[in-house]
UniProtKB/Swiss-Prot annotation:
It comes from Escherichia coli O157:H7. This is Lipid A palmitoyltransferase PagP. Its EC number is 2.3.1.251. The gene is pagP. The record marks 67 as: Role in lipopolysaccharide recognition. One of its GO terms (cellular component) is cell outer membrane. SUPFAM superfamilies: OMPA-like (SSF56925). Belongs to the lipid A palmitoyltransferase family. It is found in: Cell outer membrane.
Length: 186
C-alpha cells in the first residue's frame, strides 16, 4: 500500500470517530431535553386531561378475516393525564389509561406524549398535532409483563377537545392496529 491509501484510510476512520462523538453529544442533549420536559409537565401542568378510548381498528390487509371477526374494536376504558403547552405551542402530556384490548382484556398504559402542534386556520382553537409517545404497557397475553412502547401520535382538535391517535406496527396477524381516543382538557 502506498502512503496515500494509508492517509485515505486514516482520514476516513478519523472522520467516522468525530461523527460518532457528535451523535453521542446530541443523544445526551436530547435525553436531557426529554427528561426536563417530563419533569416540567409533572411539576407545572397547565391542564388536567380526561382520556376516553374511542376505537381500535385492526388493519384488514394484515389479518385473516376469522381473527378480525373475533377481535374487540370498541376499547371501553378511560384515563387521566396532566398536560401543558410549551413556548413554541407544542403539546406535552403525562398520562395513564386502561382499556379493553383486542381480546377484551384490560390493558393499562402510562407514559409521556409530545406533539408538534400547528394552527393552520385563522381560528386559533383548531389545531393539528404530530409527535410520539413513550411509555409502558402490559397485556394479558404477555402475562402482564411491563412492555416499553415508543409509538407515533397524531391529533386533530378544537379548543380543549382533541381526537388523538396512534398506529401500532406489526406483522401478519399481529399488531397493525389503529388506536384512537378523545382527550378533554380541563
Amino acid at each position: 500500500m502506498n502512503v496515500s491509501k494509508y492517509v485515505a484510510i486514516f482520514s476516513f476512520v478519523f472522520i467516522q470517530l468525530i461523527s460518532v462523538g457528535k451523535v453521542f453529544a446530541n443523544a445526551d442533549e436530547w435525553m436531557t431535553t426529554f427528561r426536563e420536559n417530563i419533569v416540567q409537565t409533572w411539576q407545572q401542568p397547565e391542564h388536567y386531561d380526561l382520556y376516553i378510548p374511542a376505537i381500535t381498528w385492526h388493519a384488514r390487509f394484515a389479518y385473516d378475516k376469522e381473527k378480525t371477526d373475533r377481535y374487540n374494536e370498541r376499547p371501553w376504558g378511560g384515563g387521566f393525564g396532566l398536560s401543558r403547552w410549551d413556548e413554541k405551542g407544542n403539546w406535552h402530556g403525562l398520562y395513564a389509561m386502561a382499556f379493553k384490548d383486542s381480546w377484551n382484556k384490560w390493558e393499562p398504559i402510562a407514559g409521556y406524549g409530545w406533539e408538534s402542534t400547528w394552527r393552520p386556520l385563522a381560528d386559533e382553537n383548531f389545531h393539528l398535532g404530530l409527535g410520539f409517545t413513550a411509555g409502558v404497557t402490559a397485556r394479558d397475553n404477555w402475562n402482564y409483563i411491563p412492555l416499553p412502547v415508543l409509538l407515533p401520535l397524531a391529533s386533530v382538535g378544537y379548543g380543549p377537545v382533541t381526537f388523538q391517535m396512534t398506529y401500532i406496527p406489526g406483522t401478519y396477524n399481529n399488531g397493525n392496529v389503529y388506536f384512537a381516543w378523545m382527550r378533554f382538557q380541563f
